[in-house]
A protein has these predicted regions:
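Generic start-of-chain signal for non-secretory N-termini
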Residues: 1-19
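Soluble acyl-CoA-dependent acyltransferase catalytic core bearing the H(X)4D motif
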Residues: 1-4, 23-409, 413-444, 448-454
Length: 454
C-alpha cells in the first residue's frame, strides 16, 4: 500500500475517523410503487457479485511490524455493508442530515472491507436517499466521485442496473497483497523516486519563500492564525448541505475575471468571516485555506488510492470589502498553482506533505505543540457530472460530499458540481463548530454581497 494511502490508517483513532462519504438524493420514477426502497435493497443484496476494490481490507505485514497491505475478503457479507433505514416523522431534510451526521461519526470496521452504503426512505416529499462512506485509504474524493458516477446512467429508461460495488464491465487487474520481498522492493522504489522529488520540492519551496517577500497574498505553511476551528476534536459530527445555481456562480466569475473555484473560495471566506464575527472570534490575520488539487489525469488512470496535492490560499477574512477579498483570493490561488508548475506528482505530494502531513497524523502527537496551524480550514472543489444521471429510472437530484474534519481542523467545506448546480457539503466536529448550519445562510449572503459589489 502506498504511504499516501497508509497515512490515513496510521492517523485514525476513535475520535477521528478518516473516511469520506456522500449523500445522494433521488426522485423515483412516476411508476414506482411504495416499496421502491425495499425492492431496490433486496435487488442490490441479491446481485451478489462484488468488485475487487470493495473486497479489500487492510492488514499489517511482517506480523504487524511491517508496512500496510490489502487483503481480499472472499466471504464478504453484503447485508453488513448495505443497510436499509427509514427517517422519523416528519421526514424533512433536517432529519436526513441528522442521520448522516450520526452515521459519519462512526468508524469503519478494519476487519471488513472499508465501506458502507445506506438506503434511506421516509422523506416527506417522496424522494429517497443514499449515504455511502469509504475509507480515505481506499479512495480519495475524485476517485470516489468517479466510482459513484460509474454506477449511474444518463438514460432514464435503463433498468436492471448493477449496484455500484459490482465488478466493472472491463475488469481491472487485481492488486496482489504481495509478500515481504515485494514490500522491500516497493520501499526501495519509493526511496529512489523520493530522492528526485525532494530536489524538485526544495526548489519550489525556495520560490514560494521568495514570492512571499514580494506579494502579501502569498501564504506560507504554519503562518496561519489560530482560530476556533483549530482545536482538538471529538468523534461526533454535524453535517449541513445546500445547492447553488452554477450559472449564477459562473456569471460572477466572468464579471470578476476569476474562476468558479475563486468564487467558491470567496463565498466560503465571506461566510467564515460572518460566522466568526457572530462568535466574536475573527482573528486579525487572514484565515488560510488548504485547497486540494487532484493529480489524476483522464479516466484511463488508476481510480483507487490517493493522488492529491494541497496548495494554500489566503482567504482575506481580515478585509471587509468583498471585492478586495476576492482579488486577494484570486492572486493567492494563481501564485499557489504556479508553485506546482513543472513538478512531478511525487514532488507535489512531498510539497503537500509539508502542509498536510502533520494534520493527517495529528492523533500521533499533541496537536497543541504546533504554535501556529499550517492552515485554518480545508475547502475542496471536486468536479462532478455535467448531465443528469439516473439509477434504474430514479433521477439523481442532488449529490453532497461528506468529508473529514481532522484534529486541529474542526471544519471542512467540500463542493461538487452536478447538472448545473454547485453542491456544498459542510462537515464539522459537533462540539467545536456550534450551529454549523448557520454557515449555509452566510454562504448565500456572501455570494449576494459579492454580486452586488462586483
Amino acid at each position: 500500500m502506498p504511504i499516501t494511502d497508509a497515512i490515513f490508517l496510521m492517523g485514525e483513532v476513535r475520535e477521528k475517523p478518516l473516511h469520506v462519504g456522500g449523500l445522494q438524493l433521488f426522485r423515483p420514477p412516476e411508476d414506482a410503487g411504495p416499496d421502491v426502497v425495499s425492492a431496490g435493497y433486496r435487488a442490490a443484496i441479491e446481485h451478489g457479485e462484488v468488485g475487487t476494490l470493495f473486497r479489500r481490507y487492510p492488514r499489517r505485514m511482517l506480523g504487524g511490524l511491517g508496512p500496510w497491505a490489502w487483503n481480499e475478503d472472499e466471504n464478504l457479507d453484503l447485508e453488513y455493508h448495505v443497510r436499509h433505514s427509514a427517517l422519523p416523522h416528519p421526514g424533512q431534510i433536517r432529519e436526513l442530515l441528522a442521520l448522516v451526521s450520526r452515521l459519519h461519526g462512526t468508524l469503519l470496521d478494519r476487519n471488513r472491507p472499508l465501506w458502507e452504503m445506506h438506503l434511506i426512505e421516509g422523506l416527506a416529499d417522496g424522494r429517497v436517499a443514499t449515504y455511502s462512506k469509504v475509507h480515505h485509504s481506499l479512495l480519495d474524493g475524485v476517485a470516489a466521485m468517479r466510482w459513484m458516477v460509474r454506477g449511474l446512467s444518463s438514460d432514464p429508461d435503463e433498468r436492471d442496473m448493477p449496484p455500484p460495488w459490482a465488478p466493472p464491465e472491463r475488469p481491472r487487474p487485481s492488486v496482489p497483497s504481495g509478500g515481504p520481498a515485494d514490500a522491500v522492493r516497493g520501499l526501495a522504489r519509493d526511496v529512489v523516486e523520493g530522492g528526485k522529488a525532494v530536489g524538485e520540492a526544495s526548489l519550489a519551496t525556495v520560490r514560494t519563500l521568495a514570492r512571499s517577500l514580494e506579494d502579501r497574498a502569498a501564504s506560507l505553511p504554519y503562518q496561519a492564525p489560530r482560530s476556533m476551528f483549530n482545536v482538538p476534536i471529538t468523534g461526533a459530527r454535524r453535517f449541513a448541505a445546500e445547492s447553488w445555481d452554477l450559472e449564477r456562480v459562473r456569471a460572477l466569475a466572468d464579471t470578476t475575471g476569476g474562476s468558479v473555484n475563486d468564487v467558491v473560495l470567496a463565498m466560503s471566506a465571506g461566510a467564515l468571516r460572518r460566522y466568526l464575527l457572530d462568535h466574536d472570534a475573527l482573528p486579525q490575520q487572514p484565515l488560510v485555506s488548504a485547497v486540494p488539487v487532484s493529480l489524476r489525469g483522464g479516466e484511463e488512470e488508476a481510480e483507487t488510492g490517493n493522488a492529491v496535492g494541497v496548495v494554500l490560499c489566503n482567504l482575506g477574512t481580515h478585509l471587509e470589502d468583498p471585492v478586495a477579498r476576492f482579488d486577494l483570493i484570486h492572486r493567492s490561488m494563481r501564485d499557489s498553482k504556479a508553485q506546482l508548475q513543472g513538478l512531478g506528482p511525487m514532488a507535489v505530494i512531498l510539497l503537500s506533505a509539508l502542509n498536510f502531513g502533520p494534520v493527517a497524523l495529528g492523533p500521533l502527537y499533541r496537536y497543541e505543540l504546533l504554535q501556529k496551524p499550517a492552515f485554518n480550514v480545508i475547502i475542496s472543489n471536486v468536479p462532478g457530472p455535467e448531465k443528469p444521471l439516473y439509477w434504474n429510472g430514479a433521477r439523481l437530484e442532488g449529490i453532497y460530499p461528506v468529508s473529514i474534519p481532522y484534529d486541529g481542523q474542526a471544519l471542512n467545506i467540500t463542493v461538487t458540481s452536478y447538472a448545473g448546480s454547485l453542491e456544498f457539503g459542510l462537515i464539522g466536529c459537533r462540539r467545536r463548530v456550534p450551529r454549523l448550519q448557520r454557515l449555509l445562510d452566510h454562504l448565500e449572503d456572501s455570494l449576494a454581497e459579492l454580486e452586488q459589489a462586483a
